Amino acid sequence: MNGSDKPLHIFLVAGEQSGDALGASLMSALQAKLDQSVVFSGVGGAQMGARGLKSLFPLSDVAVMGPLSILRRLPRIISRVYATVDAAVAERPDVVVIIDSPEFTHAIAKRIRRRCPAIPIVDYVSPTVWAWRPGRAKRMRRYVDHVLALLPFEPEAHRKLGGPPCTYVGHPLIERREWLESLNPTPLAERLELERDQPILVVLPGSRSSEVERLMQPFGDTVRLLHARGLVRQVIIPVVPHVRGMIEQATAAWPVRPHLVEGDE
């Protein structure tokens, strides 16, 4: 295992924007808590990149949702899986941490385990084995050494289902509780010129390009219907930069011009 005289090498694999946010927080926490330097490699997005990760490829290559979107990009996704496995095996990190997105990250973990069984593999964010397909928990033991859970009941669920050892590490929203409670909506309302005494519709198309492509049409139909009935005059859409253009184009003909907000706005 890694000695303290050389950097700890952690290979991280995220599969979408939420995983990128979790990975970035994990990187910051490890850098703050460990008494040795840390080197990161693997797959991530802008937030992980800002903390020193040079991703093997853009996260948008694999951040897709829905069977049709997956089928259209399947050759690229498969090639990215194998490229990630090849990189991990070649680099021989001290640990691999897969982050959520089990359809993508678990495919990578299984192949790393087959090719290089000595590399420890940690799964950050438990699949919802307690809700459906519980047999996954026991199968995970073949390629996951430890699970870091966001929900407090998940360690016991894994124990009962025969899954890997599991530790509750907390949910990111809990870490931001004080910030959430301190939020003052007035500055944003004033900046967007919102009428506080009127209903505000928040539209949530997600961060994946495939989600935006699939959802904006029914969202637009809903907004038109609500507007025609006099129920909606103000719309807010949280966006991430790489899908902002798609959302702007999709909402250009809406009867209500939505306010697009990014980050912690």
Explain the meaning of each model-derived region.
Residues 7-9, 195-202, 234:
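Charged active-site motifs of nucleotide-sugar-dependent glycosyltransferases
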